[in-house]
């Protein structure tokens, strides 16, 4: 059953709202995936804060027109699942991880920072650590010298106390 005009307008408005806040869009072909597997993928996407939906390509073309993602329109052919995320890495990571365990999901393309990415580009983007991981590594690197200095001072103080006693 097809969508009527009002439903189509609502879908375009919903997708446009998601795209307005997005940094990354990744598209993949989902031919032959079982419903249970697709449900697992949707759950992982929800947990990662990724908008994941199977949509008509023409509606998505309208939603991304006049945005940084408009160049993806050339890749919108066939049965596709769209992954949209405000986190630059999350959308690519969710689909790429799922594609590793399910060979029926084929990554097609993606767009990040106004550039269209091919399958290899999407996989490279997925391999980048998330923002939280990068911040925790940066914090560790910044804390390590200070923590070492404090331990050295504590050891020096303990040594002087022993010498004084």
From Swiss-Prot:
UniProt xrefs under CDD domains: Ribosomal_L10
GO cellular component: ribonucleoprotein complex; ribosome
First and last residue of the signal peptide: none
Keywords: Ribonucleoprotein, Ribosomal protein, RNA-binding, rRNA-binding
Domain of life per record: Bacteria
Molecular function, one GO term: large ribosomal subunit rRNA binding
Single biological process term from Gene Ontology: translation
Classification via Pfam families: Ribosomal_L10
InterPro entries noted in UniProt: Ribosomal_uL10 (IPR001790), Ribosomal_uL10-like_sf (IPR043141), Ribosomal_uL10_bac (IPR022973), Ribosomal_uL10_bac_type (IPR047865)
Self-association state and partner proteins as the record states: Part of the ribosomal stalk of the 50S ribosomal subunit. The N-terminus interacts with L11 and the large rRNA to form the base of the stalk. The C-terminus forms an elongated spine to which L12 dimers bind in a sequential fashion forming a multimeric L10(L12)X complex.
Function text: Forms part of the ribosomal stalk, playing a central role in the interaction of the ribosome with GTP-bound translation factors.
Family named by the database record: Belongs to the universal ribosomal protein uL10 family.
Protein name per the record: Large ribosomal subunit protein uL10
């Amino acid at each position: 059953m097809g969508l009527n005009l009002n439903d189509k307008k609502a879908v375009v408005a919903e997708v446009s709202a998601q795209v307005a806040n997005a940094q990354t869009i990744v598209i993949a072909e989902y031919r032959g995936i079982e419903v249970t597997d697709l449900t697992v993928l949707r759950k992982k996407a929800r947990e990662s804060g990724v908008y994941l939906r199977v949509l008509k390509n023409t509606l998505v073309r309208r939603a991304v027109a006049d945005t940084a993602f408009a160049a993806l329109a050339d890749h919108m052919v066939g049965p596709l699942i769209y992954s949209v995320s405000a986190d630059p890495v999350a959308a690519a990571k969710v689909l790429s991880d799922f594609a590793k365990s399910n060979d029926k999901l084929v990554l097609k393309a993606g767009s990040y920072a106004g550039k269209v990415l091919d399958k290899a580009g999407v996989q490279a983007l997925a391999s980048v650590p998330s923002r939280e991981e990068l911040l925790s590594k940066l914090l560790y690197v910044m804390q390590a010298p200070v923590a070492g200095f404090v331990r050295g001072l504590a050891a020096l103080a303990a040594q002087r106390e022993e010498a004084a006693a």
